[in-house]
Structures are given as structure tokens and as C-alpha cells.
């Protein structure tokens, strides 16, 4: 194997990414080297491409980016015991310290010292990516490559959706991006009574209808209260999944929650915004922030969902070769796509 590889790199502090030749990562004693088969583009990668304020404060240059992937192990460190060469794998993109209070208590997703693959350390938009053995997840034979490549965002959806009991509950999802749609699918799969998803993007609303979400609402044209009456809801929503990061959507969700309702919040707002805290207090709402995936319960759950028949294939709207990465990023930046998966 050559000691150089192709990778998408943030080589300079401006808009874009560039295909470069960079060294193959060195494998430490507890590390696994993975030959990447498929990569998917995340909203985080779009922020890095756009070189927005968050990216400028966060990303060291140069940096190999990307963190949604699947591949095959080609080398293991001498201390690795649970994985082997030739194994199909994906990986948890949050590298935790293992030493802080939360890590030692089994709450790694709450680690204060988390490093992000493709953010703080070299990522998976490359022919090879290196991860600690602890972060590597085996992919069963009955899970397709392209589905394993989107397990990172699917995990965000699963973590958000499973934050609260969904059985027999009425669920509102604000934001019909890929993660929002996947969250709605999980809610349906778990036995929610009515699942309503809202957005203002017609392309994403059409995708939500295509995958089988029962109640799809264009918030720019329809009043959510009217929709609730039409579908027979006499009280508010029991569970809210906030996936949009949009102030109007979040305010509408708070307004439409039942007393004692529970809201899991994954969407990141571009700037701070006001909400009516009196409604939160007097409705006795429970708000929970979500970041990433629970390690590794979320991974077990999402593998089980896929093996149990949950079809995510329609969430992938663009399948391209890695040399077409520019087209993939344009699709993601337009907001008129589902997931974009790139083949190495």
C-alpha cells in the first residue's frame, strides 16, 4: 500500500474544498485503518465548505474533512483485539477522552473533551481514515454499504426520536431535512399515533411524502392548528422533535404542545432567538438538547431498525463518484436534496 492517498482537504481559509494528495494516516497501537468505500456529505461539511463564522472559529487549516462513511479494515494496531482486516465497518465520529466524569460513568456522548473526526482530526473524505478501535462499529452483511454510510446522521435522528416514549403519542417534527424525515420514520416505526412533519421547502416536503410520512405540512401555506383539527387532534402534541433550527418553527412547536409535552432539540439555530418562556413554564414542558449519538446504544438501535425493515434508501437522493464532489456539495448547499453519498 502506498503511503499517500487522495483526500478532500480544507487547504486554505476560503470557500471550497480541494482534492489533494496527503499522507495515509499512521496507525497507533489501538487504532484501525479503514479503506473508505462510501462517504456522505453532512451539514457540518457544508459549513466547512462555505467557510462560515463557525468554520472559521473551529476548523484548523489544512484539515481532511468528512465524518459520514463506511469502509473495510485494511490494517489494525498491535493492541487491537475486537476487529480484523477485511471487516466491513463504520465508525462513531466523536472521539471521547475516556477520563472525565461522564465518560467514566458510561455517558461518553456527554464528554466535555470530545474531538470530532473531520473537524478536529483528519476525516473520512479520503481513501483511508484512522480511528481508535473503540469507535469502530461492525456492519452486518444485510446492511447495504450506502445505508451504513449515513449511520452518523441516522444516529442523530434515532437519538433524538428515542429521547422520549413514542408509543401511542402524537409527534410533531419541525424540519423535513434528511434527519428530520428519518426521525419521523423512527417515530412511526416505534408506534406513534400521529406523526406530523413541517417545513417550507417543497422539495423536502415532497421527499417526506415519498417515504411515507402521513401528515406533511407546508408551514408557509398551511396553519398547523387547522391541520391538527382536520386529522382529529383534540389536544396538543405529546412529543416534539425540533430538527429545523428555525425560530418560527420552534415557536410554533411550543405553541402546539400539550401540557407536559416533551421536546428533543437537535436543530442548531444560526443565531440566538427568543421564545415565550411563559408557555414553557405554564405548560410544564420538558426540553432536551441533543448532540450526536449515545455511545453505543444508538448504534445498536439503528442497526436493529435497518435489519427490522426500516427503509432509508429513498433518503439518499444523489449517488455520485468522488470526482463529482463539487456537484454533491452544490446539491447539499441548495437545500434541494436528501442525502448525498459519494463512491470512492
Curated annotation (Swiss-Prot):
It comes from the Bacteria. Pfam families: ADH_N, ADH_zinc_N. InterPro entries: ADH-like_C, ADH-like_N, ADH_Zn_CS, GroES-like_sf, L-Threonine_3-DHase, NAD(P)-bd_dom_sf, Zn_alcohol_dh. GO terms for molecular function: L-threonine 3-dehydrogenase activity; zinc ion binding. The record marks 152 as: Important for catalytic activity for the proton relay mechanism but does not participate directly in the coordination of zinc atom. It is found in: Cytoplasm. Its EC number is 1.1.1.103. NAD(+) binds at residues 179, 199, 204, 266-268, 290-291. SUPFAM superfamilies: GroES-like (SSF50129), NAD(P)-binding Rossmann-fold domains (SSF51735). Zn(2+) 1 binds at residues 42, 67-68. Its cofactor is Zn(2+). GO terms for biological process: L-threonine catabolic process to glycine. Pathway: Amino-acid degradation; L-threonine degradation via oxydo-reductase pathway; glycine from L-threonine: step 1/2. GO terms for cellular component: cytoplasm. The active site is at 44 (charge relay system), 47 (charge relay system). Keywords: Cytoplasm, Metal-binding, NAD, Oxidoreductase, Zinc. Binds 2 Zn(2+) ions per subunit. Zn(2+) 2 binds at residues 97, 100, 103, 111. Belongs to the zinc-containing alcohol dehydrogenase family. PANTHER family: L-THREONINE 3-DEHYDROGENASE. Catalyzes the NAD(+)-dependent oxidation of L-threonine to 2-amino-3-ketobutyrate. NCBIfam families: PRK05396.1 (NF003808), tdh (TIGR00692). This is L-threonine 3-dehydrogenase. The gene is tdh.
Amino acid at each position: 500500500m502506498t503511503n499517500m492517498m487522495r483526500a478532500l482537504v480544507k487547504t486554505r481559509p476560503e470557500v471550497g474544498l480541494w482534492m489533494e494528495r496527503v499522507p495515509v494516516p499512521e496507525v497507533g497501537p489501538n487504532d484501525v485503518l479503514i479503506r473508505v468505500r462510501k462517504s456522505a456529505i453532512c451539514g457540518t461539511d457544508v459549513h466547512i465548505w462555505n467557510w462560515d463564522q463557525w468554520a472559521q472559529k473551529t476548523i484548523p487549516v489544512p484539515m481532511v474533512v468528512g465524518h459520514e462513511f463506511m469502509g473495510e479494515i485494511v490494517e489494525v494496531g498491535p493492541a487491537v483485539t475486537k476487529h480484523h482486516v477485511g471487516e466491513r465497518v463504520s465508525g462513531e465520529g466523536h472521539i471521547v477522552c475516556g477520563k472525565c466524569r461522564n465518560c467514566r460513568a458510561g455517558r461518553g456522548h456527554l464528554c466535555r473533551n470530545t474531538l470530532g473526526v473531520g473537524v478536529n482530526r483528519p476525516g473520512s473524505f479520503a481513501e483511508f481514515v484512522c480511528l481508535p478501535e473503540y469507535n469502530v462499529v461492525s456492519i452486518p452483511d444485510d446492511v447495504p454499504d450506502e445505508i451504513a454510510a449515513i449511520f452518523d446522521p441516522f444516529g442523530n435522528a434515532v437519538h433524538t426520536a428515542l429521547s422520549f416514549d413514542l408509543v401511542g403519542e402524537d409527534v410533531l417534527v419541525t424540519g423535513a431535512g434528511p434527519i428530520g424525515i428519518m426521525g419521523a420514520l423512527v417515530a412511526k416505526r416505534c408506534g406513534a399515533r400521529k406523526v406530523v412533519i413541517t417545513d417550507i421547502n417543497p422539495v423536502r416536503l415532497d421527499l417526506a411524502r415519498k417515504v411515507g410520512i402521513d401528515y406533511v405540512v407546508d408551514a408557509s401555506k398551511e396553519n398547523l392548528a387547522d391541520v391538527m383539527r382536520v386529522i382529529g387532534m383534540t389536544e396538543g402534541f405529546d412529543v416534539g422533535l425540533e430538527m429545523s433550527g428555525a425560530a418560527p418553527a420552534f415557536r410554533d412547536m411550543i405553541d402546539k404542545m400539550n401540557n407536559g409535552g416533551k421536546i428533543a432539540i437537535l436543530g442548531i439555530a444560526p443565531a440566538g432567538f427568543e421564545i415565550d418562556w411563559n408557555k414553557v413554564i405554564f405548560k410544564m414542558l420538558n426540553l432536551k438538547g441533543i448532540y450526536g449519538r449515545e455511545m453505543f446504544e444508538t448504534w445498536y438501535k439503528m442497526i436493529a431498525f435497518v435489519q427490522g425493515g426500516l427503509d432509508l434508501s429513498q433518503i439518499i437522493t444523489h449517488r455520485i463518484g468522488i470526482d463529482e464532489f463539487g456537484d454533491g456539495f452544490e446539491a447539499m448547499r441548495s437545500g434541494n436534496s436528501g442525502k448525498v453519498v459519494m463512491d470512492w
